[in-house]
Amino acid sequence: MESGDLPALDLRNIWKVFGPGDGSRAIELVKNGMSRSDILQQTQQTVAVRDVSFSVARGETFVVMGLSGSGKSTLIRCLSRLIEPTQGEVSLSGDNLLAMNEEQLREVRRGRMSMVFQHFGLFPHRKVIDNIAYGLEVQKIDKQARIAKATEMLKTVGLDGWADHYPQQLSGGMQQRVGLARALAVDPQILLFDEPFSALDPLIRKEMQDELIRLQKTMQRTVVFITHDFAEALRLGDRIAIMKDGSFDQVGTPEEIVSSPATPYVREFVNDVPRAKVLSVKTVTVAGTAATSSRTVMSTAKIETIIPMLLEGDEVITVTDATNKAIGIVNRQSVAKILQAEQK
């Protein structure tokens, strides 16, 4: 298989056990059906990540959503080897991350992979421009080139004019933009985000989400994003993994998860989601033709976009595919069925 055909990131059967020993006994007990609490009591070991496998395509945003203690932050640290997995495999475009020595791993972190944490980690004694250029400085890029790149990234994240300020002169949202610019400056293949926006005020948080969405449209990085906020996961993710007790309950697109929650646990999150904002028109499309309707809508449009049309008097709207070919219709009844299900 050509390297371009390989996933940007591939994890297979990742386990992480904290505590004395090599963790093999705890893993065996998990496979035999013992609960995490009983394993902790019997072995003094905590099973934080349990047999997790997933791959991320180039340019995809993969969101891992879970509550506190679900293992999501441990997982992303295993992915980057900030924490060593107990068992499993991690590959970057086919390269075995777990087989790399310290120097090889440093090279990966310097250029192929960047991480953005909840706490910004900016150097208080360095100006904004020097914070952004730090990764390039570590790579021994000459000063003129790294300042030019840092200036470009500063403009990219909307902070043009703030180069000579210090971190303490910036708001929390601005500091996180600096952290994002620093991560982007080394031109990484993979960006890892560990709840980067959770400490920000709601309005600033939404701005940062919008910023990441905008950057992804133009830069197309491979992103793994950790969050405890289901709404944030729905906004950002091409695919979402719902994590509970160290393992994935369900993996799918936002639409797949909202329309078909796989477990009662996932359903608890889905129940409060306004379906019309997440589900596409194709989920309410039925067979038929609209003889009198002049209105059409793409099957990929969100349901909320057609509700005003139906309220204005259109009883039937033609649904088209990407080639503008009619594939069916949507009517008030099919939309009402979805909205009624939301109220149950």
Model-assigned labels for residue ranges:
Residues 110, 134, 165-168, 182, ...:
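Conserved signature/switch motifs of ABC ATPase nucleotide-binding domains
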Residues 80:
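Helix-to-loop junction immediately C-terminal to a conserved catalytic motif
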Residues 126-133:
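Short coil-to-helix segment of the ABC ATPase nucleotide-binding domain corresponding to the Q-loop/switch region
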Residues 88-96:
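Conserved ABC transporter NBD signature motif
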Residues 292-323, 331-344:
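The conserved cystathionine-beta-synthase
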Residues 22, 28-38, 95-96, 137, ...:
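Conserved ABC ATPase "signature" region
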